[in-house]
Curated annotation (Swiss-Prot):
Signal peptide from the UniProt entry: none
Enzyme class: transferase
Protein name (record): NAD-dependent protein deacetylase SIR2rp1
Binding site for NAD(+): 39-59, 124-127, 216-218, 241-243, 335
Binding site for Zn(2+): C152, C155, C176, C179
Gene behind the chain: SIR2rp1
Biological process (GO), any one: DNA repair
Subcellular location: Nucleus
Amino acid sequence: MTGSPRAPHQEHALGEPTVEGLARYIREKDVRRILVLVGAGASVAAGIPDFRSSDTGIYAKLGKYNLDDPTDAFSLTLLREKPEIFYSIARELNLWPGHFQPTAVHHFIRLLQDEGRLLRCCTQNIDGLEKAAGVSPELLVEAHGSFAAAACIECHTPFSIEQNYLEAMSGTVSRCSTCGGIVKPNVVFFGENLPDAFFDALHHDAPIAELVIIIGTSMQVHPFALLPCVVPKSIPRVLMNRERVGGLLFRFPDDPLDTIHDDAVAKEGRSSSSQSRSPSASARREEGGTEDGSSSPNEEVEDASTSSSSDGYGQYGDYYAHPDVCRDVFFRGDCQENVLKLAECLGLREALAKRMRFSGAAPATARKTSNET
């Protein structure tokens, strides 16, 4: 099965909520503004672990550090106190450029760019594989940063990423030559602001998107998870994942039409185990302030994008005001296989295979693909 079956007498924005129907919709509507949202599931086939898988995820392997919360490993507070923990994790992951190859998902995004159909690719991943696949920097938002550059966390002086890599691999914590502060790759820690490019995408790209394709993410990290909530309510939203995510954010064709969206349901959805990166309540030591207790410059952004926000779930109620049309579709399973199928239906399978052969890309089924980041 390539999609969710439709409820009786229910129309779908794609016409037919299948991979074939999605490809037909893209061709017939000549969709030119596709917003692609990418999570860790897209990179697991390259050999990079995700964060939340119960046995193989990064968080599952942090028990030896005796952390109160696994996300603390990626907080500035712990980095200042015990930088060796982050550097040990970074050394194990080895996400500095050149150590992993893009997967079919990454090359498919590049093909969307080449076809003139990519509005923007927003990725939660810090592995740089979208860039390695040739996605243009102008069309790429690395919302949580990457290992392509490094800087001091105190004075922000740039630091050689090559030196940072060599020192990390030798077991040394990189230090700033200007102020002696700790150096880290330019990845966004919990408690740090996301790049301006993310908010440009949130406020300017998402509202004009014609189609959203969400690949391999748990939809648990905010404000990234807000992106599907602010796209036009008339456009299709496609989820490619091993498991259903997003709670009440989505209504798929096989969902019951009589689902009640009331305050109790919304409250249940909002209380799910979400994480926020901009800034993070868990990373702050005093409520209402930043790490050092000062007022957060992005308090309004936080209020609108953390797990306590109702923005994403309130939109679900709009569907049931118009229950005759469904716009969401869920392609359950390996996101690599689903992307290969979509490429074939779009007539791009040969081009995708050529790109993968040329770049030495990771095989689409090299490893069981995770559903989240």
